[in-house]
Amino acid sequence: MLKKCIPLILLAISVHPSRGAEIRAVLAHPIFNVGYACTEHGADSSTWDLGDRFGIDCYVEKQVEVDGRSWERPYSGSGNRNEDWYAWQREVLSPCTCKVLDVSINLELNQPGRMGTKPASIFKLKREDGVIFHVVHFEKPLVKLGDAVVAGQVIARVGNSGLSQHPHIHVGAYQGSEPLQIRFDQHYIQPMEATKSK
């Protein structure tokens, strides 16, 4: 008698001590004044620092039409040049009304598709309630240490420095030793731009 073989698949699951617990969120002003998309960092995605856990990587997308078809994408052409990316050199807006707690600048520019090395250019911005935001991978800062900024104020331009493979802005937040999930205030979200390609 033949027995049916059932393949056994084993999955390695990383157990996180707070998995299942509700993650506190913080409301932030959108980081761009045009339509954009973000990818999120999970609880186990980084152990570098509190500004990385639950952080998000945001980039500008455009509605692209080619030969009667349309979709959203973050770059034109091959994407091999920083200038191909729609986020490149866009204005970066402050996520909060806060004070500039720290500024670090990395002038080394990455090429898309090639990971750079730490550190990236970073702002640390502190709200009155103690929430600290990290805004990372920018260039051409417009504010300095100790400046007071308001939510939505232009603070820099999008760059591509540090541990980054393409032009984008990373935003992270924490209060004390607790990382926070970021939610952008949708009252200020702008529509996506459109472009036509040949």
Segments and roles (model prediction):
Residues Y86, L93, V131-G152:
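Short histidine-centered loop motifs in beta-beta connectors
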Residues A21-F32, Y36-D52, P119, K140-V154, ...:
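Acidic, glycine-rich catalytic/binding loops that coordinate metals and/or anionic ligands
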Residues C98, D147-G162:
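Active-site-proximal beta-strands of protease catalytic cores
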Residues D102, H137-K140, R157-N160:
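A residue-level detector for short acidic-glycine micro-motifs
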Residues L8-S18:
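Hydrophobic h-region of N-terminal signal peptides that target proteins for export
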Residues S18-P119:
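Surface-exposed, glycine-biased beta-strand/turn segments
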Residues P112, V158-H170:
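Active-site loop architecture of trypsin-fold serine endopeptidases
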Residues L2-L8:
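Sec-dependent signal peptide recognition
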